């Protein structure tokens, strides 16, 4: 039984989901705006927002934990150097999900995921 198990499987194995959200998180932090399906966008929020909260307190332990989740030195550097200080005064809600219609081909609902207060 899967009672009280949070998270959506999205038709993928656990390792595939982990790799997909790792890649999506890196893309989001690099470009600050990505387009994806609505269910993936909602699930990405559960992965990316705790990383930004972690980046608000710069420590070696937090950097190592973020690297274990993202596996990209460049994105960890941007996370702790740019994004953490940017959201220092904001108590959560770092991402905005905007619906943007349906995909041609399979009619999947699409959404933009963007970091709030981006320039």
Curated annotation (Swiss-Prot):
Entry's Gene Ontology BP terms: translation
Task: List the Gene3D superfamilies hit by this protein, alphabetically.
Answer: Ribosomal protein L17
Q: Which domain of life is it from?
A: Bacteria
Q: What would be one Gene Ontology cellular-component term for the protein?
A: cytosolic large ribosomal subunit
GO MF annotation list: structural constituent of ribosome
Keyword terms of this UniProt record = Ribonucleoprotein, Ribosomal protein
Recorded hits in PROSITE patterns, A to Z, give: RIBOSOMAL_L17
- Ribonucleoprotein as a keyword of this entry, yes or no, is yes
Q: Which PANTHER family match?
A: LARGE RIBOSOMAL SUBUNIT PROTEIN BL17M, RIBOSOMAL PROTEIN L17
**NCBIfam families per the UniProt record, alphabetical:** L17
HAMAP family registered for this protein in UniProt? Ribosomal_bL17 (MF_01368)
The family note in this entry says: Belongs to the bacterial ribosomal protein bL17 family.
Q: Quaternary form?
A: Part of the 50S ribosomal subunit. Contacts protein L32.
Name the record gives this protein: Large ribosomal subunit protein bL17
């Amino acid at each position: 039984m899967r009672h009280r198990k949070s998270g959506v499987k999205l038709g993928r194995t656990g390792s595939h989901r982990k790799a997909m959200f790792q890649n999506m998180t890196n893309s989001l932090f690099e470009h600050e705006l990505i387009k994806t399906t609505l269910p993936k966008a909602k699930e990405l929020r559960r992965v990316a927002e705790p990383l930004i909260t972690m980046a608000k307190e710069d420590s070696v332990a937090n950097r190592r934990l973020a690297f274990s989740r993202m596996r990209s030195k460049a994105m960890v550097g941007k996370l702790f150097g740019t994004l953490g200080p940017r959201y220092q005064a904001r108590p959560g809600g770092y991402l905005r999900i905007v619906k943007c219609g349906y995909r041609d081909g399979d009619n999947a609902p699409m959404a933009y995921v963007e970091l709030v207060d981006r320039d």
